[in-house]
Swiss-Prot record:
<comment type="subunit">
    <text>Part of the 30S ribosomal subunit.</text>
</comment>
<keyword id="KW-0687">Ribonucleoprotein</keyword>
<dbReference type="GO" id="GO:0006412">
    <property type="term" value="P:translation"/>
</dbReference>
<dbReference type="GO" id="GO:0022627">
    <property type="term" value="C:cytosolic small ribosomal subunit"/>
</dbReference>
<dbReference type="InterPro" id="IPR000266">
    <property type="entry name" value="Ribosomal_uS17"/>
</dbReference>
<keyword id="KW-0694">RNA-binding</keyword>
<dbReference type="InterPro" id="IPR012340">
    <property type="entry name" value="NA-bd_OB-fold"/>
</dbReference>
<dbReference type="InterPro" id="IPR019984">
    <property type="entry name" value="Ribosomal_uS17_bact/chlr"/>
</dbReference>
<dbReference type="GO" id="GO:0019843">
    <property type="term" value="F:rRNA binding"/>
</dbReference>
<keyword id="KW-0699">rRNA-binding</keyword>
<dbReference type="Pfam" id="PF00366">
    <property type="entry name" value="Ribosomal_S17"/>
</dbReference>
<protein>
    <recommendedName>
        <fullName>Small ribosomal subunit protein uS17</fullName>
    </recommendedName>
</protein>
<comment type="similarity">
    <text>Belongs to the universal ribosomal protein uS17 family.</text>
</comment>
<keyword id="KW-0689">Ribosomal protein</keyword>
<comment type="function">
    <text>One of the primary rRNA binding proteins, it binds specifically to the 5'-end of 16S ribosomal RNA.</text>
</comment>
<dbReference type="GO" id="GO:0003735">
    <property type="term" value="F:structural constituent of ribosome"/>
</dbReference>
Amino acid sequence: MSDNNEKQTLRTVEGRVVSNKMDKTVTVLVERQVKHALYGKYIKRSTKLHAHDADNACNEGDVVRVTEIAPMSKTKNWRVVEIVTRSAE
């Protein structure tokens, strides 16, 4: 087992806010490209994450950077670190 002194790196991903209807929570769509095992074609895959937005600062369409945290609820274990770009609205 590893030492407790080693700092564990937290995963950080970028995605687009698709919903901000919940209080202090946003839904972030994270897209990635995966290579098909047999044919080699790159395919888009996406994941929706619930992230904590303490200030309710995010709007739909914003590109945000989120990082992993300890679970805050059943589905929410990400936190908005920064808003990379604002939506045009």
